[in-house]
Structures are given as C-alpha cells and as structure tokens.
C-alpha cells in the first residue's frame, strides 16, 4: 500500500526515469567506444596484414618426420595437408602430413573441380586451391572482397588457411535457404559462384 502511494508521486517517477536514462546513455556510449576501438584494431591490422603464400617446410631427406603439418582435419575418409597433398585418413602420418609414398597420396588434386573453381569434394577444393598458379586468383579475390568479408579474412595467416576458409560452403554456393546452386560443386575457391540450377 505504501509502495503504491510512493510510486504514484511524480518526483519518484522522475527519479526512476532519470536513473534509467543515465544508465541507457552510459551503456550506449561504452558500446560505441568498444565499436570504435574494434574498428581501429581491424584497420591497423589490415594495413600491415599480408598473406604468407609459400608454406615454409624443410623436406630434408624426404622422410618428413622432422616438422609438423596442418591438415584439413574434418574429412571422414580424405584429408589435405598444407603442402597440397590429398590422402586417405589411414595414410596420414603422426606429424599431420600425408604419406607421399602411399598410393592414395597426390599433390594439387583437382579431380572433382570444375573450371570455375567449384568442387564436389572439400579436400580436393583445398588441394586445388593450394596450387601455386592459383595465387593471382586468390589475390584478386582478397583485393575485391567486400569490407565485411575482408574482416573475416584478417585472421587468415597463409595460403593454406585462406584455401581452408575459401573452400568452405559459402552463401555464393546457396541458391535458396538450404538448396545448393549445384549440389555436385558446392565447395568453391574461384571468383564466380556455381551456375544456378532450375528448382
């Protein structure tokens, strides 16, 4: 009863409104400061951010046991290592590299890829994208990428990471919601998306 009477008084409502307004304004200004700081960090990183195009790797006596390799990890049966070798999961060495002596291992495989750079198998897309002659294509893509897309690729450090990111299914591969433009070629590293198929 007393609380109801107190809340009906104009000065109490004014104080509650004033405190709410102060809280709202301070929260908004803090959020704006964070946004400005984040933009500044991205711009600073963009200006000096360069992709490392050649993977530094010492083959030594070709046993390849000395160094570690990163690989595409996610494949159920196939994997691609950072040197562009595609191999079956069973032919992966402990250091993460494909065993180049295994019959299933091949470098720079474009088996399931079309001329527009779209492939039906993710690992072949990454391997094909890692070919040294694909560097100009990827540089053109990075230079023409929309601002929001460039922010996504600022975390990419080298050619391998760029190919991993580029070959993942993107919105360019999708025709409508969960329908692919071309279900047989949904992993793309190229500039042009797959052709639209009739629904």
Curated annotation (Swiss-Prot):
Q: Which GO terms describe its cellular component?
A: Golgi membrane
InterPro entries xref list: SPRING1
The entry annotates sugar attachment on 61
The keyword Lyase belongs to this UniProt entry's keyword annotation: no
Main location (coarse class): Golgi
Task: Please tell me whether the keyword Glycoprotein is annotated for this protein.
Answer: yes
Q: Which residues lie on this side of the membrane: Lumenal?
A: 30-199
| Chain ranges on the Cytoplasmic side, renumbered to this chain | 1-11
Gene Ontology BP annotations: intestinal lipid absorption; positive regulation of SREBP signaling pathway
Keywords, A to Z, come to: Glycoprotein, Golgi apparatus, Membrane, Transmembrane, Transmembrane helix
Query: What is the annotated localization of this protein?
Result: Golgi apparatus membrane
Membrane spanning stretches: 12-29
Record's bilayer topology term: Single-pass membrane protein
State the family named in the UniProt similarity comment for this chain: Belongs to the SPRING family.
What exactly does this protein do?
Positively regulates hepatic SREBP signaling pathway by modulating the proper localization of SCAP (SREBP cleavage-activating protein) to the endoplasmic reticulum, thereby controlling the level of functional SCAP.
Name recorded for this polypeptide: SREBP regulating gene protein
Source taxonomy: Eukaryota, Metazoa, Chordata, Craniata, Vertebrata
Question: Which gene specifies this protein's sequence?
Answer: spring
């Amino acid at each position: 009863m007393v609380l109801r009477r107190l809340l009906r008084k104009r000065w109490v409502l004014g104080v509650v409104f004033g405190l709410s307004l102060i809280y709202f304004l301070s929260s908004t200004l803090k959020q704006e400061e964070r946004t400005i700081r984040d933009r500044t960090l991205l711009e600073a990183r963009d200006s000096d951010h360069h992709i490392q195009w050649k993977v530094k790797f010492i083959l030594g006596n070709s046993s390849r046991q000395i160094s570690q390799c990163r690989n595409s990890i996610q494949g159920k049966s196939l994997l691609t290592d950072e040197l562009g070798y595609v191999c079956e999961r069973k032919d992966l060495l402990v250091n993460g590299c494909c065993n180049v002596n295994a019959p299933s291992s091949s470098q720079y495989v474009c088996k399931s890829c079309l001329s527009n750079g779209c492939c039906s198998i993710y690992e072949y897309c990454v391997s094909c994208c890692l070919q040294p002659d694909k560097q100009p294509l990827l540089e053109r893509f990075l230079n023409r990428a929309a601002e929001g897309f460039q922010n996504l690729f600022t975390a990419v450090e080298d050619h391998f990471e760029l190919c991993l990111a580029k070959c993942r299914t993107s919105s360019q591969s999708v025709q409508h919601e969960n329908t692919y433009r071309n279900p047989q070629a949904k992993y793309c590293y190229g500039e042009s998306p797959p052709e639209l198929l009739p629904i």
